[in-house]
């Protein structure tokens, strides 16, 4: 939805004049964003060392439990991510329209693809002026769904499936996620895909940070501060 199509509304939902500042991201969305960022950073660091362990240290295991702590932190961060992902899905149903943008792409909409192409031109410096959107514009919405939402769900499912190997067949993890082994009977395959999923998300994170900084500067609308205050500020008005 572009800024031209969005009117401020009062408490009764009546149309009012267009504003330069629009409340976009509700508090639960912002809290989830930063907890999710912390969880992903923790999972990426600990997951890397789980896949590429540190050199063995001689001595009793009880005195050299570093890898055990790394695994524990990884499992704890994974469960934190999963809990808040469930809460985030819930908020997509009860929150405002912007709260559900990352969970779907309107593939059926010709207008979506037309504006998607315009944004591709803007990001590749082929278009001089961007359109202003209150929420996500079509290109980030498309990218977040394919390179973040779906991979995040995949990582949660495969992560709990791998955890169930140690928890045992009588665990709730195996009861809910044991079916993954019917798709990939070889546990190493799941480890490999889980590892590759991490890199997909990390590539997305790097692009996400670059685009957020770029848009804050070039498109003259607040991006980074919006995920702190919830308000999107348009620094100049389109005629």
UniProtKB/Swiss-Prot annotation:
Q: Which Pfam families match?
A: Ni_hydr_CYTB (PF01292)
Q: Where does the protein end up? A: Cell membrane
Which keywords are on file for this protein? Cell membrane, Electron transport, Heme, Iron, Membrane, Metal-binding, Transmembrane, Transmembrane helix, Transport
TM regions (residue ranges): 31-51, 75-95, 142-163, 196-213
Under the heading InterPro entries, the entry gives:
Cyt_b561_bac/Ni-Hgenase, Di-haem_cyt_TM, Hydrogenase_cytochrome, Ni-dep_Hydgase_cyt-B
Instruction: List the Gene3D superfamilies hit by this protein, alphabetically.
Output: Transmembrane di-heme cytochromes, Chain C
| Keyword Membrane attached | yes
* Signal peptide span: none
Cite the PANTHER family for this sequence. Answer: NI/FE-HYDROGENASE 1 B-TYPE CYTOCHROME SUBUNIT, NI_FE-HYDROGENASE 1 B-TYPE CYTOCHROME SUBUNIT-RELATED
- What is the official name of this protein in its record? Probable Ni/Fe-hydrogenase B-type cytochrome subunit
Q: Which organism is this entry from?
A: Rhizobium leguminosarum bv. viciae
Q: Which gene encodes it?
A: hupC
């Amino acid at each position: 939805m572009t800024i031209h199509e969005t009117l401020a509304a009062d408490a009764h939902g009546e149309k009012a004049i267009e504003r330069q500042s629009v409340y976009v991201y509700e508090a639960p969305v912002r809290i989830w964003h930063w907890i999710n960022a912390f969880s992903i950073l923790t999972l990426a660091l600990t997951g890397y060392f789980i896949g590429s362990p540190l050199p063995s240290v001689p001595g009793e295991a009880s005195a050299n439990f570093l890898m055990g702590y790394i695994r524990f932190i990884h499992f704890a961060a994974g469960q934190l991510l999963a809990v808040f992902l469930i809460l985030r899905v819930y908020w997509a149903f009860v929150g405002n329209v912007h709260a559900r943008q990352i969970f779907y792409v309107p593939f059926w909409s010709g207008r979506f693809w037309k504006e998607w192409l315009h944004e591709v031109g803007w990001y590749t410096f082929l278009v001089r002026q961007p359109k202003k959107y209150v929420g996500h514009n079509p290109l980030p919405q498309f990218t977040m769904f394919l390179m973040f939402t779906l991979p995040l769900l995949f990582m949660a499912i495969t992560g709990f499936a791998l955890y169930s190997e140690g928890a045992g067949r009588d665990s709730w993890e195996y009861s809910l996620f044991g079916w993954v082994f019917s798709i990939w009977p070889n546990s190493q395959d799941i480890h490999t895909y889980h590892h590759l999923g991490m890199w997909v998300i990390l590539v997305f994170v790097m692009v996400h940070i670059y685009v957020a900084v770029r848009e804050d500067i070039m498109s003259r609308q607040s991006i980074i501060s919006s995920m702190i205050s919830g308000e999107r500020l348009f620094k100049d008005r389109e005629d």
